[in-house]
Amino acid sequence: MSNNQILFERAQKTIPGGVNSPVRAFRSVGGTPRFVARAQGPYFWDADGKQYIDYIGSWGPMIVGHVHPEVLAAVQRVLADGFSFGAPTEAEIEIAEEICKLVPSIEQVRMVSSGTEATMSALRLARGFTGRSRIVKFEGCYHGHADSLLVKAGSGLLTFGNPTSAGVPADIAKHTTVLEYNNVAALEEAFGAFGDEIAAVIVEPVAGNMNLVRGTPEFLNALRALCTKHGAVLIFDEVMCGFRVALGGAQQHYGIAADLTCLGKVIGGGMPAAAFGGRRDIMAHLAPLGGVYQAGTLSGNPIAVAAGLKTLQLIQAPGFYDALTAQTKRLADGLAAEARAAGVPFAADSIGAMFGLYFAERVPASFAEVTKSDVERFNRFFHLMLDEGVYFAPSAYEAGFVSSTHDDAVIDATLAAARRAFAALAA
């Protein structure tokens, strides 16, 4: 029995399912999860000492690679001064100033500890600001595990949303309307039917939790125009795509300003940190200035802020995103070429430092299209690549991530492994 198997059996005795987040359990792909012993640059090593090229990067944060020496040094410098204070620090101001500089639509920002906290707080703030209750979200977009966001579409536009998790009361789900991603007609119909009830529309402008699916410019511009017309708050959930698709995130890429933005992952540099921010007039409704309550014991934790601030400084290096975008595109295009050469139906896409792999004839534009991908073939490909020492997301419904440490040699090794994997799939 491998060390990974021993650890997984042991973990299941004290941790539900043996993991602290469901996707880590390998339920989608089968087999035994890899327990990570250490990581460096683009690699990690599991409990059995096997090395893997890592295309998860802690699900997005590790944009400069694992254990970057400057991030490590920044963390080490603050450790001796104390781990947590429950009081303000100058470093909190510095990271807030950096975020506001990089994302111009954010005039003020509040630090929290997780993406779920950020989206949950942004929705409460939008409701408090507008005095309305209804939230609009989109099928396939994931915004954390707050009750009002674990909702799927009802049988028709005007029906109540349905919970996607046990434990979510129908009375909460009924305030959330779920529409098809990238469907402008459905969006216009919804605003025409109940536009004056909508407190906020929350969207991943680049979705990463139904695999990688880009928002179309037409869809996102329609969102901006309709929210403005009807007085609804437009919330961009950039927890995943923020500082991933461009230095200024999806808002820079598309040239669209949100009213509120949720950030996470990269801004913590691998530490637990997230944030939400936006227009000053909306943020003024937050306590202690306004009546919308939000708080957190570990918000602005000095260790997380040190890692995040240094990461935000590193990604501003000249040419950083040009190189990262080109390398990610080289990976995606190379995988598609290897599949094509083997005669395996496959498509790939990339934007910035995010990529998507689809066992389908074309890149999907909605959750419904994503679900038509060949999941069984993806699962086989995942394990073939795992055996080769390449670690992709253990689910056909997750995006992948490239770091600045994924150099040409790493990409070459990945494509060589993929050539063998696709050949095995075609056999």
Curated annotation (Swiss-Prot):
Q: In which pathway does it act?
A: Porphyrin-containing compound metabolism; protoporphyrin-IX biosynthesis; 5-aminolevulinate from L-glutamyl-tRNA(Glu): step 2/2
Reaction(s) catalysed by this chain, per the record, are: (S)-4-amino-5-oxopentanoate = 5-aminolevulinate
Family annotation (InterPro entries): 4pyrrol_synth_GluAld_NH2Trfase, Aminotrans_3, Aminotrans_3_PPA_site, PyrdxlP-dep_Trfase, PyrdxlP-dep_Trfase_major, PyrdxlP-dep_Trfase_small
- Indicate yes or no for the key word Isomerase: yes
Protein's cellular compartments: Cytoplasm
Q: What class of enzyme is it?
A: isomerase
| N6-(pyridoxal phosphate)lysine: residues carrying this PTM | 265
Annotated GO MF terms: glutamate-1-semialdehyde 2,1-aminomutase activity; pyridoxal phosphate binding; transaminase activity
Q: Which cofactor does it need?
A: pyridoxal 5'-phosphate
- Give a GO biological-process term: protoporphyrinogen IX biosynthetic process
Q: In the UniProt record, does the keyword Cytoplasm occur?
A: yes
Q: What subunit structure does UniProt give?
A: Homodimer.
What family name appears in the similarity comment? Belongs to the class-III pyridoxal-phosphate-dependent aminotransferase family. HemL subfamily.
What protein name is recorded for this chain?
A: Glutamate-1-semialdehyde 2,1-aminomutase
Q: Please give the organism.
A: Burkholderia vietnamiensis (strain G4 / LMG 22486)
